Design a protein with these regions (language model features):
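Basic polycationic patches enriched in arginine
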Residues: 11, 19-20
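Extreme N-terminal tail/first-helix region
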Residues: 24-54
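Soluble catalytic domains of membrane acyltransferases
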Residues: 31, 51-210, 215-219
Length: 219
């Protein structure tokens, strides 16, 4: 359910209608900027993770207030609720990309309120450019969560849209993780894109290699 990556070429020319629509989706109001509910859900999330044996590691460096998050491994529908709870626990302000099918009525409003951005990869769109613009234009902290696998199924190659969003927005890439075997989750290393995609992807995949998703055979 949760998660949809984008490719480098999912872009259109600046000023197009599609550009304005996607940018509006990216900047919509979410549960993370709803004060009372945010506070209550943070208390619930911290308590739930602690009771169920999860350990939340790391914290977001100040220079990463605007950033692109890698979300991996992505192998289960459970990844979304855990991601949301970790975001509350770490006081993040996230938006996440999800496949268009989970945004259909009657769930569209709820999914967008939870920070979702619908992605329809069957159609040409401008998600990379619009997401980068949204990060740059944000008045406060904004973390865009992208699962580079793009699906819960096992894939040979990761999609690179997250990388090009970070390059275009001139923001760092934060490696976040969920390890269901060790029950650890949180924020890992920060990568500043060098422009050498191949070398940077080698470093990213090396970091994620030890982690096990809920369905490890799919990672």
């Amino acid at each position: 359910m949760y998660g949809e990556a984008c490719d480098k070429d999912t872009r259109v020319e600046p000023g197009s209608t599609a550009r304005r629509i996607t940018l509006a989706h990216t900047m919509h109001r979410t549960i993370f900027d709803t004060p009372v509910i945010n506070t209550l859900l943070r208390l619930f999330s911290v308590a739930f993770l602690r009771i169920t044996g999860w350990k939340v590691q790391g914290s977001l460096p100040p220079e990463c207030a605007k950033s692109v998050f890698i979300a991996a491994p992505h192998t289960s529908n459970w990844d979304l609720p855990y991601t949301l709870m970790v975001a509350f626990a770490l006081r993040l302000n996230i938006y996440w990309m999800g496949k268009e099918s989970i945004f259909k009525p009657p769930f569209r409003g709820l999914m967008m309120w939870l920070g979702g951005i619908p992605v329809d990869r069957a159609k040409a769109n401008n998600l990379v450019a619009a997401s980068a613009d949204a990060l740059q234009a944000a008045d406060g902290p904004l973390q865009l969560v992208v699962p580079p696998e793009g699906t819960r199924s096992k894939v040979r190659y990761w999609k690179t849209g997250f990388y090009y969003i970070a390059v275009a927005a001139q923001v760092p890439i934060v490696m976040s993780y969920l390890d269901y075997h060790q029950k650890i989750t949180g924020i890992g290393p920060v990568l500043r894109p060098t422009g050498d995609l191949e070398a940077d992807m080698v470093a990213i995949k090396a970091f994620y290699a030890p982690f096990k998703g809920k369905n490890p055979e799919q990672f």
